Amino acid sequence: MPNRKIEIVTTNCRRCGKSISTLSRSLIGADALREELGGICGDCITPEERQRIEQGTLLAALRQCAAAGTS
């Protein structure tokens, strides 16, 4: 996958409309999770969604570390 520039973008929460800042793509390759839950502000995210984000981020980071170790 080619390296695309990562930018900070301002958008609105999909649930309440509050202005939020986010990254244009995931730093660690969790783009599918970012697409699904990335446009929701901290006030609107549910505990279950927060847990999915934490677990998904950890797994993506571990995959990145494992891939770096095999290079």
From Swiss-Prot:
A GO term for molecular function: DNA binding
Record-linked InterPro entries: DUF2688
Organism: Escherichia coli
Lineage: superkingdom: Bacteria
Protein's name in the database: Protein KleB
DNA-binding region: 9-28
Keyword list, A-Z: DNA-binding, Plasmid, Transcription, Transcription regulation
Gene name of this polypeptide: kleB
